[in-house]
């Protein structure tokens, strides 16, 4: 009793924190004094019984714990009302306690196993990424063999099943993981590919045969209309195959990024092109595919560029509203990035990007207008800044390859898509930007850039039927350049105006500059006048050009330049006379626009002298341009002498032949000089040639000159000496000819 009072007294002296840390009841309250030990043992024995009269011992223990906790809180309310009030204000969850809450909490803490364990499905295992065995442990990877691949191939051709397709996809993913160095992915896969022969066989099987079997499994027979695209999601088996197809498509994209061999990459891209309907089902994989195709379209080998573009246009044609606009934006940015530098080797690739990008823009003129308006406006802003500030940095932002190629791209796009009501309003602002680019720095050093702009305007004017005053920018060069001035230096290499924008001061003094300039002026004038050759106003249009060309012929004294310009003038005057004679027979006036258009259309179909000449000239010129791009045509025409250095063995053979002929000539004197055939003459032509070649191997012409002099009977030839003098010469120093070997026949 005294011990109980002391414990109770200590309880009253406890603080709130100490009270919460200790139990709520004293030992006397939880267990009455004098409780027999046998009763305690009986309680423990009852707890061990699996079933009691009132239910399971676990449930009774939960219920007893909840009621006991309630009693403790009620006693706390009587003993310490202040602390109980504190709990009411700060911890209501402790006071609002029920038997059900206690049972639920304890059930969460004590987990009970179900009667039947649920097995994971193949799809859940696929998303988990880690194949596991029946006990939840990671199972060992199965090595793929050639026999397994052949077995899969034969089974797929006979009848492809979802389970077989799942296994093949797992093996294909393991093979692709090895190409990326993904060791963890290869280890966690169900299969493992370690042999290169197995890798090649597996990839070949998947690319060539697997999707054909899958198509047969999903749709049965092929559709009668081959142009109609079947949606894989319309098949009843799609739900079972969806995740495996998704994993396979992702692996194919990874494989395209890893393959370096062009032929293998081309085969994979052909497979990707045939599987575009499957990519369209998965937007994420489709975006990944488009991003990779844009990279190949701009940087890949020529065949890969074409195949990548085929994939791009297939996707954009079927999903215009989703993918066309972002793909156009990405392709334009990539195009600008890749045309920063231009050379004869990169120019065909830039032209390919221009044409293919134009083809994508033609899919939807509404989307094309949005992009064209935005980027033409951007070019105009750069030009305006350069015209207002007049600093070197600002005009360099315009006079560069990226700006010029962008101008040419939009001129080509508007020309190709024409006629289009949506893009028609952009012709005028684009032509003004090009003309402003020409007028920004109109000096001789930027004539190549002017010619690029003139070509773009000519293309735009001819294709859209819009009159653009291009001829003044060509004729202005005839007035500014003095073609009679003697060149300051002569260059053996011609200037390729197709791959330059600016000429150096040294180039302006070269003869090759004026030769190329006259040739370019001839081409540009003929191209522009050909586009206007059917016009009813052609005689009046070419009048300034005729006057300028006649003035050039009067002033120029260079025959080659005059011959080209005179030929151009004759063709222009012939075409003007033809148009003048034909239009005299018409009865309508120039104010009748419909009649004028009909007459011009009929004239174009019938042809004019200038158009007939242009068609023949164009064929020859295209061939010449291709040769100039390769950089070989002009150097072949110059016929430079080649310095060929003979080998030591060749020299000895030729020396033997020369000495043999020489000794045949002196055969009459053999009796007087018996030892002559065994020693060479120091003054012989072969000996002089040998010495000169040893002194200077790079000068082959000098040796040939000595030989020619000897053959003509020059003073160096010793053939006219008498035998005694020849004998004295033969006794000369032997070290000069010790390397020569005479033929044993002599």
Swiss-Prot record:
Acidic residues composition bias: residue spans: 26-36, 119-128, 664-674, 733-746
Biased composition (Basic and acidic residues): 65-82
Pfam families associated with the record: Noc2
GO terms classed as biological process: apoptotic process; negative regulation of transcription by RNA polymerase II; ribosomal large subunit biogenesis
Similarity section: Belongs to the NOC2 family.
SUPFAM superfamilies xrefs: ARM repeat
UniProt subunit comment: Interacts with p53/TP53. Interacts (via the N- and C-terminus domains) with AURKB (via the middle kinase domain). Interacts with TP63 (via activation domain). Interacts with histone H3 (via N-terminus and non-acetylated form preferentially). Associates with core histones and nucleosomes.
Residue numbers spanned by region Disordered: 19-82, 117-141, 662-746
One MF term in the entry's GO annotations: transcription corepressor activity
Known role: Acts as an inhibitor of histone acetyltransferase activity; prevents acetylation of all core histones by the EP300/p300 histone acetyltransferase at p53/TP53-regulated target promoters in a histone deacetylases (HDAC)-independent manner. Acts as a transcription corepressor of p53/TP53- and TP63-mediated transactivation of the p21/CDKN1A promoter. Involved in the regulation of p53/TP53-dependent apoptosis.
Descriptive protein name: Nucleolar complex protein 2 homolog
GO cellular component annotations of the record: Noc1p-Noc2p complex; Noc2p-Noc3p complex; nucleolus; nucleoplasm
Location(s) in or outside the cell: Nucleus, Nucleoplasm; Nucleus, Nucleolus
Positions carrying Phosphoserine: 56, 93, 667, 743
Keywords, alphabetical: Apoptosis, Nucleus, Phosphoprotein, Repressor, Transcription, Transcription regulation
Taxonomic lineage: Eukaryota, Metazoa, Chordata, Craniata, Vertebrata
TM regions (residue ranges): none
UniProt keyword Acetylation, yes or no: no
Keyword rRNA-binding: no
